Amino acid sequence: MSAVLTAEQALKLVGEMFVYHMPFNRALGLELERYEKAFAQLAFNNQPMMVGNWAQSILHGGVIASALDVAAGLVCVGSTLTRHETISEDELRQRLSRMGTIDLRVDYLRPGRGNRFTATSSLLRAGNKVAVARVELHNEDQLYIASATATYMVG
């Protein structure tokens, strides 16, 4: 029998799983700066492997989309799994295994120049089957680099 988690413990576990246990997300160097039921903030540093335009040292569009996807996924999944005061760890893992991105619509607004980037996401709506989030990516100078609307299967 698995441990029973409070909503706060479940949210913490989801954050750790998304950011620190998924190999691709670890490779991106994502850092979870803030995570609440309907808000998440991730940050990461630009690395040579993330450059899509080597002549200008611009962040690859796939890296941008990935960071936006993770940030949006955190709020969609977190809000769904913490609807009740408690959840068993087994149920959390089982439900999480059935959740995933349905659609990710990215607007690349500026070239991804910078050394450090921050993705912030907020929940727009969470239903029984589908959740939607809005995400923004800024660099260390607070330049608005990209935005996304993301839809997730959550039920």
UniProtKB/Swiss-Prot annotation:
Coiled-coil annotation reads none
Q: Recorded E.C. number(s)?
A: 3.1.2.20
Sorted keywords for this record are: Cytoplasm, Hydrolase, Lipid metabolism
According to UniProt, the reaction catalysed is:
a fatty acyl-CoA + H2O = a fatty acid + CoA + H(+); a medium-chain fatty acyl-CoA + H2O = a medium-chain fatty acid + CoA + H(+); a long-chain fatty acyl-CoA + H2O = a long-chain fatty acid + CoA + H(+)
- 4Fe-4S recorded as keyword: no
Q: Where found, per UniProt?
A: Cytoplasm
| Ion transport found in the keyword field | no
Q: CDD domains, from UniProt?
A: PaaI_thioesterase (cd03443)
Single GO MF descriptor: acyl-CoA hydrolase activity
Q: Name one GO biological process term.
A: lipid metabolic process
What GO cellular component term, any one, is given?
Answer: cytoplasm
Its top-level enzyme class, in one word, is: hydrolase
Broad class of where this protein is predominantly found: cytoplasm
What the entry lists under Pfam families is as follows: 4HBT
By sequence similarity, the record places it as follows: Belongs to the YigI thioesterase family.
Please give the function described in this protein's UniProt entry.
Displays thioesterase activity against medium- to long-chain acyl-CoA substrates. Is involved in the thioesterase-dependent beta-oxidation pathway of (9Z,11E)-octadecadienoate (conjugated linoleic acid or CLA), along with TesB and FadM.
Q: What is this protein called?
A: Medium/long-chain acyl-CoA thioesterase YigI
Q: Which organism is it from?
A: Salmonella typhimurium (strain LT2 / SGSC1412 / ATCC 700720)
Q: Which gene encodes it?
A: yigI
